[in-house]
Amino acid sequence: MSQPPTAPPVTQEIPLQCEDELGRPLTFVSSFGYDPGDPYAVWLTFHIPGGDVHWAMARSLLATGIDEPAGEGDICLWPNLDSDGRAVVSMDFHSPEGRLVVEARTRDVYQFLARTWAVVPPGAEADNVDLDELVDELLAG
């Protein structure tokens, strides 16, 4: 199966707000990434003092979380307002190591998603998946 050439990845630095263990406001930068070769996923890399932490989530989950509550289990998102009344997307991440609840400005998240949609429109993700290569990888184990 011949695939069209893959567009370059999309990345964007987005500031995230949360509270530290003492309830003080904390802002740090996260890298949001999208690779058209893995068209269903977005990657978040939290740049924190203890080292980078990577999370993957469905691009559709991130898009849904802008307008309505979405997700269950490890990642939940919902629209919210920050303390200044600005639209944000709240994101709740759970892992065996702990929990992190952050807020990102909705406009930043939407800008990132719009850039990914320009590369691979919603609904066209399957056009960017090489099924033959995927089967070969699965069989190679």
Question: What annotation goes with each model-predicted range?
Answer:
Residues 52-96:
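Short, internal acidic amphipathic alpha-helical interface segments
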Residues 17-19, 45-47, 78-80, 94:
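A structural detector for beta-sheet-dominated domains
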Residues 94-141:
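Mixed-charge, glycine-accented linear interaction segment located at domain edges/termini
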Residues 25-70:
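Short, well-structured hydrophobic secondary-structure segments
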Residues 22, 36, 50-52, 83, ...:
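Residues that cap or initiate secondary-structure elements
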Residues 44, 89-93, 102:
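Generic recognition of long tandem-repeat/solenoid scaffolds
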Residues 1-41:
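Charge-rich, low-complexity N-terminal segments
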Residues 12-16, 55-56, 102:
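Generic detection of short hydrophobic beta-strand segments and adjacent strand-loop junctions
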